[in-house]
Structures are given as structure tokens and as C-alpha cells.
Curated annotation (Swiss-Prot):
One of its GO terms (molecular function) is protein-glutamine glutaminase activity. It comes from the Bacteria. Its EC number is 3.5.1.44. Pfam families: CheD. Keywords: Chemotaxis, Hydrolase. It comes from Cereibacter sphaeroides (strain ATCC 17029 / ATH 2.4.9) (Rhodobacter sphaeroides). HAMAP family: CheD. CDD domains: CheD. Belongs to the CheD family. One of its GO terms (biological process) is chemotaxis. This is Probable chemoreceptor glutamine deamidase CheD. PANTHER family: CHEMORECEPTOR GLUTAMINE DEAMIDASE CHED-RELATED.
Length: 199
């Protein structure tokens, strides 16, 4: 069968699983980034003109949004991602972001998910990076897939029977915009778009 477009086939797709503390970026149309989020935040950034994008995955060490040391950790996660995109040819003024996660998963983590979500939104606002979509909070884990070349994102809410990676606050990171599609875990059908546009 001859393909009539230039989209990569399933056999060409490379899926990279992005774990807590990681930051990745690519300009490849064959690359897909995947992660599972509870209280953690992932930021999907893309320069749609340059065709480059990346994802980070982090959890602030506490729910104290005034703790300067903890906020530096979150800022470092964001700066790593931005710098990775710039090295691939992105222009900072064109970078767009989508943010996901920040759920309240366990009583032990308390309001840390809410604090992570608040940090991410504030950081983007303060840095002048346009947030084109976000899905934050709640009490369910999320599975995210991100196509860095185009900025396309898929989100699926997970059920209680799904295994969510153990999230632990940490101080160190590992290693140096298209459509958003939402899916329901139980019927795998596309959901009405619940994206909240930033105010």
C-alpha cells in the first residue's frame, strides 16, 4: 500500500517514556513522548514554526509555594526544557506550552499537586510563554502522549485499576503546538474537549 501523505507509519514511530525528573526534546516527526502523571506536572512545549518540541516531568519537593529552594527546582526543570528547544532552533518568543497533571492522588502528598499546577501556570505567565491549553487537578492519574514536531497532545484519564508510578518529591533532575485530544480510559472514545483556556 502506498501512503498518500508524509506521516510516519506505526513501525517508524519511536515512543520515549518520560519519567519523573526527566527532560527531553526533539525535532523528529517519528518521535512521541509518553508519560503517566499523578501529582506531578508535565510541560509540553513546542515552537510550531521551527517544528521542535519537548517535555519535562517534575514534582516540587513540597506544597510550600513560597519556599525559594523548592521553586528553584521547578524553575530549573522549565529552563532545561526551554534551553533544549533553543538548541534545536526554537525561538523563545514562538514557544507555546501545554501543561498537565497536578492531581491529588494520596493524602500523604497533600496539596502538592495543586502547588505544582500553580507553579507551572505562574512560571509560564511570568516568563511570557503562551499557555495554549491545560488540564490540571482532580483526583485521577493521566496518561499523556506528545508529538514534539507538531505540538499535538493526547490525554487519557486512568482508572483506579491502573498502575501509577510511585511519585516522590525530589530536588535533582535527571540529565542535563498542535491539537489536544482527550480520551476516556473506560470507553477509549474521544471526550468533549475539557481544555481550560488560561485567563
Amino acid at each position: 500500500m502506498t501512503r498518500c501523505d508524509d506521516r510516519p507509519s506505526a513501525s517508524q514511530i519511536s515512543i520515549t517514556h518520560v519519567t519523573q525528573g526527566s527532560c527531553v526534546a526533539s525535532a523528529s516527526p517519528n518521535e512521541v513522548y509518553a508519560t503517566i502523571l499523578g501529582s506531578c506536572i508535565c510541560t509540553c512545549m513546542c515552537d510550531p514554526v521551527a517544528g521542535v518540541g519537548g517535555m519535562n516531568h517534575f514534582l516540587l519537593p513540597s506544597a510550600d509555594v513560597e519556599d525559594a529552594q523548592h521553586l528553584r527546582y521547578g524553575s530549573h526543570a522549565m529552563e532545561l526544557l526551554i534551553n533544549a528547544l533553543l538548541k534545536l532552533g526554537a525561538a523563545r518568543q514562538r514557544i507555546e506550552a501545554k501543561i498537565f497533571g497536578g492531581a491529588m492522588m494520596t493524602p500523604q502528598l497533600g496539596a502538592i499537586g495543586q502547588a505544582n499546577a500553580a507553579f507551572a501556570r505562574r512560571y509560564l505567565r511570568d516568563e511570557g510563554i503562551r499557555c495554549t491549553a491545560h488540564s490540571l487537578g482532580g483526583n485521577r492519574a493521566r496518561r499523556i502522549r506528545f508529538w514534539p514536531k507538531t505540538g499535538r497532545v493526547q490525554q487519557m484519564f486512568l482508572g483506579s485499576e491502573d498502575v501509577v508510578p510511585n511519585e516522590q518529591p525530589q530536588f535533582r533532575l535527571q540529565g542535563g503546538a498542535g491539537d489536544v485530544t482527550f480520551f476516556d480510559r473506560h470507553n477509549n472514545a474521544e471526550m468533549p474537549d475539557p481544555i481550560k483556556e488560561p485567563r
